Regions:
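Acidic, metal/ion-coordinating pockets
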Residues: 2-268
Length: 268
């Protein structure tokens, strides 16, 4: 990453967990403008892989969260669930999918977002433990860092993974190499936000934005039926009070992490 840029400058990020369905989008739209004002947020990063009915990203839902304040949208294993994604993902510079899909996948696994005098790199990878088969996320991040580290002042990584152990391993693997590593996918915010020994901010999972009384956003009765019958069940999004999960990352003038705090709003 680049060296310190002269002049006083503190950069604040709002990094938001998986937004689930219509209620998630409405909750995102409700809280993000308020938080941007309250915390003087400069850049909003959000995982959007569940914004279209809980599965995937549509053109309409992507535009909606951009209008609500998202600057960069990451994703995960549900990125392809809406067929229309392939018609526009290559035209969206700040919508990224896991970089460790095999060569030839539409879209990109990282982006560089310019903000004032800074270039912000964001990398998205998927874990492999209890997840669909993918290329190695550790090797893929190394490959991307070689390509972009000299272009970027700040680098954020979203590891979309099931296993906390894999996310923690990625955090320590990248400690001192990137600014921040956040986990997504499990939809439950973890209480382990910290600054690692070499200065990288880390949290195992950001949590989700969407229905609170649910099984990861899904109607709990659907989930119970699935577990009891071991047969396919049509999942529907839950309704009721919502939860909003995110972190605020504050960087000092030299791009080091000044603070890394969780945000959790429960409307129940």
């Amino acid at each position: 990453m680049k060296n310190k840029i002269r002049g006083e400058f503190i950069l604040k990020f709002l990094i938001v967990g998986d937004v689930c369905g219509r209620q998630g989008r409405e909750t995102f739209r409700k809280y993000v403008p308020e938080l941007k004002k309250e915390h003087n947020i400069d850049v909003v990063v959000v995982n959007g892989e569940n914004i279209a009915g809980g599965r995937g990203i549509s053109r309409k839902t992507l535009d909606e969260i951009y209008r609500a304040g998202a600057d960069i949208v990451t994703s995960g294993n549900h990125i392809w669930d809406q067929k229309e994604i392939v018609s526009f993902i290559d035209d969206e510079p700040f919508l990224i999918r896991p970089a460790n899909y095999p060569e030839g996948a539409p879209g990109k696994g990282y982006c560089i977002y310019p903000f004032k005098a800074k270039n912000i790199g964001v990398i998205n990878v998927s874990g492999r433990t209890f997840m669909p088969p993918m290329d190695c996320p550790f090797q893929k991040v190394d490959e991307i860092l070689k390509e972009i580290k000299n272009q970027c002042d700040i680098i954020l990584v979203d590891i979309h993974a099931e296993a906390t152990s894999e996310k923690i391993a990625m955090g320590f693997y990248l400690d001192g190499k990137v600014t921040c590593v956040v986990g997504t996918h499990t939809h439950v915010q973890t209480a382990d936000n910290r600054i690692l020994p070499k200065g990288t901010a880390y949290i195992s999972d950001l949590g989700m934005v969407g229905p609170y009384n649910s099984s990861l956003g899904i109607n709990v009765n659907n989930a119970i039926d699935k577990f009891i019958t071991c047969r396919p069940v049509r999942f529907e999004m839950a309704e009721g009070p919502n939860i909003f999960s995110a972190v605020v990352l504050e960087l000092a003038e030299d791009n080091s992490v000044k603070s890394f705090e969780r945000i959790l709003f429960n409307e129940e």
